[in-house]
Amino acid sequence: MQRSPLEKASVLSKLFFSWTRPILRKGYRQRLELSDIYQIPSADSADNLSEKLEREWDRELASKKNPKLINALRRCFFWRFMFYGILLYLGEVTKAVQPLLLGRIIASYDPDNKVERSIAIYLGIGLCLLFIVRMLLLHPAIFGLHHIGMQMRIAMFSLIYKKILKLSSRVLDKISIGQLVSLLSNNLNKFDEGLALAHFVWIAPLQVMLLMGLLWELLQASAFCGLGFLIVLALFQSGLGRMMMKYRDQRAGKINERLVITSEMIENIQSVKAYCWEEAMEKMIENLRQTELKLTRKAAYVRYFNSSAFFFSGFFVVFLSVLPYALIKGIILRKIFTTISFCIVLRMAVTRQFPWAVQTWYDSLGAINKIQDFLQKQEYKTLEYNLTTTEVVMENVTAFWEEGFGELFEKAKQNSDNRKISNGDNSLFFSNLALLGTPVLKDISFKIERGQLLAVAGSTGAGKTSLLMMIMGELEPSEGKIKHSGRISFCSQFSWIMPGTIKENIIFGVSYDEYRYRSVIKACQLEEDIAKFAEKDNIVLGEGGITLSGGQRARISLARAVYKDADLYLLDSPFGYLDVLTEKEIFESCVCKLMANKTRILVTSKMEHLKKADKILILHEGSSYFYGTFSELQNLRPDFSSKLMGYDSFDQFSAERRNSILTETLRRFSLEGDAAVSWNETKKQSFKQTGEIGEKRKNSILNSINSLRKFSVVQKTPLQMSGIEEDPDEPSERRLSLVPDSEQGEAILPRSNVINTGPTFQGRRRQSVLNLMTHSVNQGQNIHRINAASTRKMSIAPPANLTEMDIYSRRLSQESSLEISEEINEEDLKECFFDDAENIPAVTTWNTYLRYITVHKSLIFVLIWCLVIFLAEVAVSLVLLWLLGNAPAYNKGNSTISANSSYAVIITSTSAYYVFYIYVGVADTLLALGFFRGLPLVHTLITVSKILHHKMLHSVLQAPMSTLNALKAGGILNRFSKDIAILDDLLPLTIFDFIQLLLIVIGAVAVVSVLQPYIFLATVPVIVTFIILRAYFLHTSQQLKQLESEGRSPIFTHLVTSLKGLWTLRAFGRQPYFETLFHKALNLHTANWFLYLSTLRWFQMRIEMVFVIFFIVVTFISILTTGEGEGQVGIILTLAMNIMGTLQWAVNSSIDVDSLMRSVSRVFKFIDMPTEEGKSTRSIKPSKDCHLSKVMVFENPHVKKDDIWPSGGQMTVKDLTARYLDGGNAILENISFSISPGQRVGLLGRTGSGKSTLLSAFLRLLNTEGEIQIDGVSWDSITLQQWRKAFGVIPQKVFIFSGTFRKNLDPYEQWSDQEIWKVADEVGLRSVIEQFPGKLDFVLVDGGYVLSHGHKQLMCLARSVLSKAKILLLDEPSAHLDPITYQIIRRTLKQAFADCTVILCEHRIEAMLECQRFLVIEENNVRQYDSIQKLLSEKSLFRQAISPSDRMKLFPRRNSSKHKSRPPITALKEETEEEVQDTRL
């Protein structure tokens, strides 16, 4: 960043904002980079501002029982705030004085008052000076208030972030991500722009009193008629506002429904394509869009009338003020023109400034109170440590996640009177839930000496992670004592990777030790992985480590924990994502050798780990089931296997037992007490929750097996559009903005630079922060991501674009002592953005405008209609000129008033009186037409938005995966949310305002030019100057806005990253470091925002300077030109003053239109995406059967020409090569093999070898070369949908969209209920579905969060059965499954797919033994393809993975079936008394 010219700028340069000229010049000539942005002043740095506010807040906390945040803010910012308020008031006073001088100038043209005529020139000078004074007061005041608002936002941003790092885990579990994002965006954004309006709460009333005093002098009591009309108008607009809010509230829910489905579609686009659901998803989304647009039109019409009422009220205000006075006394032109000028100022004060100011105060005080409540939440308390102790002791410890744990689950109760769901009845789903007082850990005791290894085991949800949390101090014990030294290192169960390099993630701010670092890298098996990267360990990782496999992330997290020199190491299931070979090696080299002298607590379920542990603690339902050595365990607890693995023999489970497990799953429900829904209303059966940080928690989601524990949570994040999940009392009139999203689906909120409007999209169910922290990367069904490319393949991510990472990137110095630097260099700055650097011009091209106008044919005719109505209004204005020109002739002979003023009377009892009313009648008719003229325009522009949304949705669904892989899920979602909302809401009315303002200016210039042609000569250069200024400013401002929007991403990325790794941060004591990084991100955003505010003020001031010069010229031309009557002078000066404000408004509106049209450009960019190669141009709706006609079928013994295809499932792969991107590196090369019909083939290979990629290539989801034939039919000879229909797919990432069970199983509605129930029976889903009200019509939301992962896998299995596919692709179907569901899947595969070809990618040896042949993939190629017997007899990866005991036990069983052409699946393995070993490959 460059040093700011502001530091050395003179007073005049600061006053006129001339110091911004270098950046404006540079932005006009070339594209701006972050290196071009100026450094922020030290007074604006987050460090200084946060320290200042934190000091005052601490003072407030210490001195009062009821501390008020507003008092702390007042002590920090009050005097500057008031100073700029006084400047603003003085500037506004000049507006009230200007009409007085205008009236005196008009009066000076009285033919009988020659003295007054001689001072007209001085009055003109005075009037021009008032404009100059106003300009010099108003712009510094507005900028100063914007600046203070920015500083307040920064200070509170920092204060909130620091508080977040201190919050207790109990509090975090009650706060949703949406609430935090809302707190840091919607609420704080109110200060940026709102502060400039806040002073009008007292300025506007004073101004009204001053203006009414002046109008009383002119019109006496009749002046209050105009004021009364304005008050009625303000109340009318308030009513329209409430009506608009009602429509927006209704519409927000519809928008949310559409965006939920859209985001699920985007995030799971690969599954959509694999299932051939493109048409079904398109139809589903379009139906929701239709409902949404009905409400959108209603809201737009109300907003249109609200806006039009202001524009057309000016005539009636003047008319109602003047008419009573004229009827009684008659009126002269001077009073009319003076009244017009007064009423313009009065109208703005009453209908705009005062209501806006009141709303600003209401919103700001509400935001301050929310922040104040948040800042007083309970904080995390560290335990008291004994630094001298060398042992870890826990004595009789009991703990609750909150007092009286056992969440008060909301049970369903159907009220027979009002059909509402209410809380309190525990009879519908649950029985015997005596949950109050249920502890998460009960009476736990153990003691381990220094250097010992304690293995903690237990079933899912037994309390293992809670035990580690209690040692770390995250969970406070209610009874008992804990003793240890306090020097802790921690490795989370779910890998946490911060954006940055591998080295940064491992060192994590600890001083660098080369030998220790290399030892840790080696022990954690990271050497080979690091060697593959060109930058080695300095490669920049994306948010959440998206560029890495799950195993690599797990090893880096482990390496971070091991690198820190601590007394106690807490390792929470660190081997969950590792293949069995890597796991064995790391356990031996790292845990057993490298850490041999350290105290270790390892959470594990592996038998070999228990054998090598010094002590074993087995937990069961929160209690200590066993504590001792392994030999004692075998002797004392021979039944420990079932407690360890979490299940007994599957065959011992009755249907009732399995249903009771489902009942545990149903505890995931929470019902909103006031939701007026009926169980029978299918669209309203989604269980909603409020986002309240309130008295009752409504988001408790517990695991589905045997437990009420806290940390077995697999919960899905709801869509929080605009990143917002507001409190129930939050106004729904919100800025429309999207938050970057994280890997877990949180949002990032872009903020408009002026005043944003738009709906809030509320999530249906809130995601607590605690659940985010305990959320598995692989288990999470993400809705949209913040800073990472979407992984749209089954498991392996394509190489990410490393130019889009966060500010953490490359922060290690290259010196030998590698402390993490706290400086941000320009390389870092380039990598901090969310959105791709858009290839969109700084200024919207004319081609975009032309294409937008021609989207809908009638739009051109609507524009012509508006122009015709405008020309009619101009004609009426010319009639007025004629009346004014002839008024003296009428009045000379018939006036009843004094001769001194008879020359100027236009309303008398003579014929002129009637002529005037004829004019009024014509004017009213045209005003009525003008009032409605924009309605067709708004209606048509919304229709254009509808068409563009449809085209973009179709384009995205038909785009190839190589194109979609190059984009981010969050970026695509922004097009459907933020950009479509702009097309729906902002663009139509902004275009209407601009056209209307432009026509008003043209009309006023035309009238003035007719009266005084010389003025037209002065008008031309002014308009040309405005156009040049606009073009000059627009190039820079749009780039600065883009940089500011992008610079906001690191703030929210850092917030979500910190939340996900909060336990790790605390364990490592890195809160200060992360606070520093957060301040750096804030400063980066501030630099862009401050520069944008400064350049905007430069532009506004230059526009006003040009106008002041124009007004001076007009004034002196009018005054110095002889022979002018007071009527013409009054019209010229009044219109000139009106032109000033209107032309400025029009120029600003044109800039807004250009800015909003960038959304149209982005939408067109998506519409123009390529479609999948070979995609049929006609619509292909999947049918039950696929008959091949006119398709070349290769000779194949397994298929007949007339058969339904595919009939056998024989598959031949020839020279298959696959790439993620066009021209990219080959991920698979020259793969060739053949599969017989009905054969089962297992895919083997280490993590990242390409197994899942091969399955994607079969479905043509990648760029592929070579050929695949199924039953003799080549993939080149049929459409993509026909090809993909041949496959049934159970992906690693399960896709459950928001909709009914029926829709999820059969989105095309091809099958009857009987057929669906039959399949549900086959896969074991019937008992699950029947538990829900509505059964097949029950609405699943949030990725089916009420279902366990196993139930979701069964849904995928049911889809495959319904598809009648002959080839089944399974990508790690047993990952994260409970044992029961796993056995159901195995049984279903045996029964429902007995005659199908199965290709299985799996880590569990037990599952792989069902296969007849194995395909071993290494280094992108097929290394081996043979039977299990052959692989076991040779040196192979399979032989390395399987133990000798398993080989001896399992080989004969497999060998006995080798003579059969297609052996049946081995009978389900009964649970024995032998050791249970979860062996995975």
UniProtKB/Swiss-Prot annotation:
Transmembrane segments: 78-98, 123-146, 196-216, 223-243, 299-319, 340-358, 859-879, 919-939, 991-1011, 1014-1034, 1096-1116, 1131-1151
Name of this chain's protein: Cystic fibrosis transmembrane conductance regulator
Position of sequence motif PDZ-binding: 1479-1481
Oligomeric form and interacting partners: Monomer; does not require oligomerization for channel activity. May form oligomers in the membrane. Interacts with SLC26A3, SLC26A6 and NHERF1. Interacts with SHANK2. Interacts with MYO6. Interacts (via C-terminus) with GOPC (via PDZ domain); this promotes CFTR internalization and thereby decreases channel activity. Interacts with SLC4A7 through NHERF1. Found in a complex with MYO5B and RAB11A. Interacts with ANO1. Interacts with SLC26A8. Interacts with AHCYL1; the interaction increases CFTR activity. Interacts with CSE1L.
Top-rank taxon: Eukaryota
Compositional bias segments (type: Acidic residues): 1471-1481
Stretches assigned to the ABC transmembrane type-1 domain: 81-365, 859-1155
GO biological process annotation, one example: cholesterol transport
Region (Disordered): 1449-1481
Keyword Transferase found: no
Membrane topology label: Multi-pass membrane protein
Cross-link (Glycyl lysine isopeptide (Lys-Gly) (interchain with G-Cter in ubiquitin)): 688
UniProt EC number: 5.6.1.6
Organism name: Microcebus murinus (Gray mouse lemur)
Lipidated positions per record (S-palmitoyl cysteine): 524, 1396
Family named by the database record: Belongs to the ABC transporter superfamily. ABCC family. CFTR transporter (TC 3.A.1.202) subfamily.
